[in-house]
Regions:
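A short, basic-hydrophobic beta/loop patch
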Residues: 2-9, 81-119
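Short alpha-helix boundary/capping and kink motifs at helix termini
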Residues: 38-94, 106-107
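An acidic, glycine-rich, mixed-charge low-complexity segment common to nucleic-acid enzymes
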Residues: 1-65
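Short amphipathic alpha-helical surface micro-motifs
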Residues: 27-28, 65-68, 96-100
Length: 119
């Protein structure tokens, strides 16, 4: 049986500035800040890891990635993870914060439901 993945009820405070930094590579800093404020206000939704992965169109970071390895260790130690921050953009999904968490959870159990804030 696959070990459960534990989650915080809400993203941690440091996830939002990280989201702004990443989104600022794709849109203007003003738009990135506005999107991040909308993410703060958004309710938590749940999506399967495999669906987030497919919608993002991103390659999967492997076990050799240090951040993925650290997150897999947290899962094994039953430590809580922070929900993802997602932005719908055109016909794709942008992972504003939580890419390595998504990759780790996908490798652990691709059918696991991941809590997310999505706008």
């Amino acid at each position: 049986m696959t070990k459960a993945v534990y989650w915080f009820d809400e993203p941690e405070d440091h996830n939002y500035p990280a989201g702004v930094e990443y989104l600022s590579l794709l849109v203007t800093p003003e738009v990135a800040k506005a999107l991040t404020q909308r993410l703060r206000d958004a309710p938590i939704s749940h999506f399967k890891a495999k669906d987030i992965f497919r919608a993002s169109g991103l390659p999967l970071a492997g076990i050799s990635n240090e951040q993925v390895e650290k997150t897999l260790h947290k899962i094994e130690c039953e430590k809580k993870l922070s929900p993802l921050l997602l932005v719908r953009h055109m016909n794709s999904l942008v992972i504003a914060d939580g890419y390595h968490r998504m990759c780790a959870v996908y490798q652990h159990d691709q059918d696991a439901k991941i809590p997310c804030k999505i706008v």
